[in-house]
Amino acid sequence: MEIKSKNDIIDYFASGIKQDELIGVENEQFLFNIKTNKRAEYENIKKLLQIFITKFGWQEIKENDNLIGLKFNGKSISLEPGNQIELSGDKLKNIHEVCVELHNFQKELDSACFDTNLTNMATGYDPVTKLKDAPNNPKERYKIMTNEMPKGGELSLNMMYQTSGTQVNMDYSSEEDFKKKFKLMCYLTPLAIGIFANSAVYENRASGYLSYRAKVWQNTARAGLPKIFLELSLIHI
């Protein structure tokens, strides 16, 4: 998208207005080889994805003839740069439906992991693997990001290869609704980081943070917002 004026930005957000106000959740996890205690390599991941296809009916997603993800009934499975596996959930009405969706996926993932000698770890930061030893996969976008991201943040590669997390996507019904939800989420994010902090360890030693993931994401090229977004003069909640 080429931005030529302020209205281009306004129109982009206006085009996203929805009346149903659904939510969707993206959930990432690390995968480890239980025989080596190391992160799963791409060859391991391909076998895991094949289990989802043959056992649970998922459909493959390929790039340059490489298996890089799956799709099924509004959901998709994709790989992050360090082979973190991500479920991008369907558009749902409430968190109860999200909970059911995630539990169903976890059952399938546990079964596929058992068949491929893998195990999952749902932490914000890989507690044992050094960055130089993190695995990768053949997605073209990640090759570009690996070269470009460090130019804008000293921990950008750590963010790409060593972190996992949960993202919540929410519809908005109007410009006013967007402003209220956006500002509220800006305020709630630090609280969520504190409540769900589970990444105090990295490279087998204490990081000095309860959430080292949060520390890493403050030093990347793609995170953070100007303080103007929190100015009280913008909107009252």
Residue map of PLM features:
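Flexible helix-coil linker/hinge segments at domain or subdomain boundaries
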Residues: 116-122, 190-210
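A broadly tuned preference for mixed-charge, low-complexity surface segments
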Residues: 79-85, 134-138, 169-176, 218-229
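Terminal catalytic/cofactor-binding subdomain
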Residues: 1-154, 162
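Short, conserved secondary-structure transition motifs
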Residues: 127-135, 201-227
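Short secondary-structure transition/capping segments
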Residues: 108-112, 160-177, 204-215
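Conserved small/polar residues in nucleotide/adenosyl-binding loops
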Residues: 235-237
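Internal, well-ordered domain-core segments that constitute the primary functional module
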Residues: 140-195
